Amino acid sequence: MIRPIAVAIAVLALTACGGGGSNSSSSSSLPQGTTPVKLDPADFTTNIDNPYWPMRPGSHWVYREVENGEALEDTYDWYAQDSHGNLWYLGEDTAEYENGKLKTKEGSWTYGVDGAEPGVVVPASPKQGMTYREEYYAGHAEDAADVLKVGSQVQVPLGRYRGALLTRNYSTIEPTVEEMKLYAKGVGPVMELLVSGGSGRTELLSFSR
């Protein structure tokens, strides 16, 4: 399910076992569709330096999406970077609220549990036209993304950024829903816009390292 950018992020060391991961960021080597992947911890690094989302343990980004003045969702996401610079998405713990009360945790998933597969949120060297899976948990989380532009401009409450990465994000579960996301160099995701299947806007309020 397509969801707002996380309100808090935990950087994890990969502990799964298996074969090698992607060794480049061409679309053909990135995770696609429902195809399983096996990630080898030896292919990963604790130095998270992808230029469009650098992070280290303790990094904290704060976002807000509101409707009628109320927060809709809190999410914790887990990421790891391979030695080539691809930033992998390994799971999320999400909670949606309605009238201030927990409504559902639908969409939560963890790589390797109940058939859930990881995806990539930011390729090592994104290029226009790239496409890749972001997450796959059958019937619950089936997001993918296309790179639309490298070099966009964006302004959010925290500031104005040039050279941003612009992606189109969509899900086979919600085929009428489409979002655009922008990632600023040296910062990470700064804006998310729902452009089809509704309306909504998520912006970066603050972040710390």
Regions found by a protein language model. Give the residues of each.
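C-terminal motif of bacterial Sec signal peptides marking the signal peptidase cleavage site
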Residues: 13-16
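Bacterial N-terminal signal peptides that target proteins for export
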Residues: 1-6
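Conserved functional acidic sites
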Residues: 18-209
